[in-house]
Amino acid sequence: RVISGGPLYISDGLGKTDPEKLWPVIFNDGTIIRCQDVGRPTLDCLTAGNVMKEKPLKIYNKYGDHIYVAAFLDRSSLKAVKDEILLKDLPGTENGKEWYVYDHKKKAVDKYDGFTYEIKPGEANLYQLIPATGKFTMVGLINKYISNGAAEEKRVGDDICIWEMKADGDFRFIAEEDGVKVTSSTGKVNLIREGKLCTVKNVKAGEVLVCRK
């Protein structure tokens, strides 16, 4: 439903909804964070045979200039399948930009140079393709499926970026260089860096982060 860009339906019985499964798709006030277009199959899935059994079904959609790809493999599939995400199968990527791929399940990022993944029967994987914006590139709030929909870029420059949070959670961005400094409108910053991936823990809706080199 999240990748479709459409409404979100809940069919649980009264009192049986698990809130932890809803928070990744909503803002603090209950508004749905959804993609801005209609979910469509990637071009390779249009002509492939036995999709969902021998090849994952991949659906893509957009939020801003980020592209989200969800991959699905039917439970009746006999084994795990290896597949790839190619820019040529994603209309809108023919601009010569550099891209990152963020794996929402592994919480890991790679610079796009062709992307291969493995999916098991019954699994659904979510990948976020992010155009590089220089020294700093926003991923967004990683506790939300549509991560960049939960944070707003107020300013993007070579040596400074300003982001405003639209929900609570953990904010993540990519830094190509060392020596990154982050300040917050709250005065408190819990910054964790793992390689190029930087995470500011426990941000709040309305909080503004300023990142400088």
PLM-predicted stretches and their roles:
Residues 1-136:
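Active-site-proximal substrate-binding groove within the catalytic cores of carbohydrate-active enzymes
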Residues 45-48, 67-71, 105-213:
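Non-catalytic C-terminal accessory domains or segments of carbohydrate-active enzymes
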